[in-house]
Regions:
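Beta1-alpha1 glycine-rich phosphate/pyrophosphate-binding loop at the start
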Residues: 1-62, 66-67, 147, 153-185
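FAD-binding core/adjacent interface of flavoenzyme oxidoreductases
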Residues: 57-147, 165
Length: 185
């Protein structure tokens, strides 16, 4: 949606456009691992739509589409607001793929936005803290093993990022970095 709006704006499309999204911020998903590692800031990886839209003909509307009336050419939001259109572009986004791996949905963090990256960072740091304080080798091994579901570009990038980050974080807790395992499924 954002790319379409910006492209039309750059081509000087003369008609008013509405970009409707349920989130306030756009997510550069391939860069979420950079937010996790603090190599980039929240605003770089997860900027507000309003900051990206420097175009007089595009208006950002935060909301969730409840219905589309094709006959009336109207988009209705769950807030009760509705918007008329002459042309409609639907961009529905994506969903996480767990590749049929049992338990993956329930036992993993989906990395979909900045909040997910922050939650994952906090979770990993808490596990490292726990591991540094336990003398039980088996429990420590469990705490220091991270599995990544998905061996595509994002999964491999995440594995590489965690392979760098976790030892840095664990070293600060005086932990043995050789005990850390990052596994890609």
């Amino acid at each position: 949606g954002l790319l379409t709006a910006l492209s039309l704006c750059n081509k000087r499309y003369p008609h008013p456009m509405f970009l409707i999204d349920q989130a306030e911020r756009f997510v550069f998903k391939p860069l979420l691992y950079e937010l996790l590692s603090s190599e980039m800031t929240t605003n770089q990886v997860w900027p507000r739509f309003t900051e990206l839209l420097n175009c007089d003909t595009v208006t950002f509307v935060q909301g969730r589409v409840a219905a589309i009336d094709l006959d009336k050419q109207e988009v209705k939001l769950d807030s009760g607001l509705s918007y008329s259109y002459g042309k409609l572009v639907l961009t529905l986004g994506s969903t996480a793929n767990y590749f049929g791996i049992r338990g993956a949905r329930e036992q993993t963090f989906a990395l979909r936005d900045g909040n997910d990256a922050i939650a994952l960072s906090q979770h990993l740091r808490a596990r490292l803290q726990q591991a540094s304080q336990t003398s039980d080798r088996q429990q420590r091994q469990s705490l220091l093993t991270v599995a990544i579901v998905g061996a595509g570009p994002a999964g491999i990038e995440m594995a590489a990022t965690l392979g760098d980050l976790l030892p840095q974080w664990y070293r600060k807790l005086n932990g043995d970095i050789n005990e850390i395992r990052v596994v890609v499924l």
